[in-house]
């Protein structure tokens, strides 16, 4: 099965629920999203150094989203769901190989953002930043 077939099946699966849609080509969109990912990784590192693991993880998770969105934008898509976004077939392998960690990051982000402060372990925040840096590098390499 080709990459095009995988993308076509992905689009068909999610477009009916309106969680993914085609968007007009915008050559600057991938660059803008990568810049935002870089900014969010820097914010994550700054917050971790300041001792705020919650904020560090939230920014690192956002960087993962921004990097994935750069590839989606390059290919003319916009996703309204993390499940949809992170299942895009053309994402670098890190998004598949680290799926368990991404799920833990997402869950911890939800708790930190909506339920309870000081809920993110410092080690998980550090892992989130490392993963965001790795994903950003892999996305940059394929753009």
Describe each PLM feature range.
Residues 1-143:
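Terminal alpha-helical segments
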């Amino acid at each position: 099965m080709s990459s095009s077939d995988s993308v076509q099946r992905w689009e068909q699966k999610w477009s009916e629920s309106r969680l993914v849609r085609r968007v007009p080509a915008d050559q600057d969109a991938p660059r803008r999203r990568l810049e935002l990912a870089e900014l969010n990784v820097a914010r994550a590192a700054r917050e971790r150094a300041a001792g705020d693991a919650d904020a560090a993880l939230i920014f690192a998770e956002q960087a993962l989203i921004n990097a994935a969105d750069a590839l989606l934008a390059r290919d003319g898509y916009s996703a309204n769901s993390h499940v949809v976004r992170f299942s895009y077939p053309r994402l670098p392998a890190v998004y598949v190989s680290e799926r368990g960690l991404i799920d833990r990051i997402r869950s911890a982000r939800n708790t930190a953002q909506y339920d309870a402060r000081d809920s993110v372990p410092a080690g998980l925040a550090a892992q989130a930043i490392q993963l965001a840096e790795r994903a950003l590098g892999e996305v940059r390499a394929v753009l």
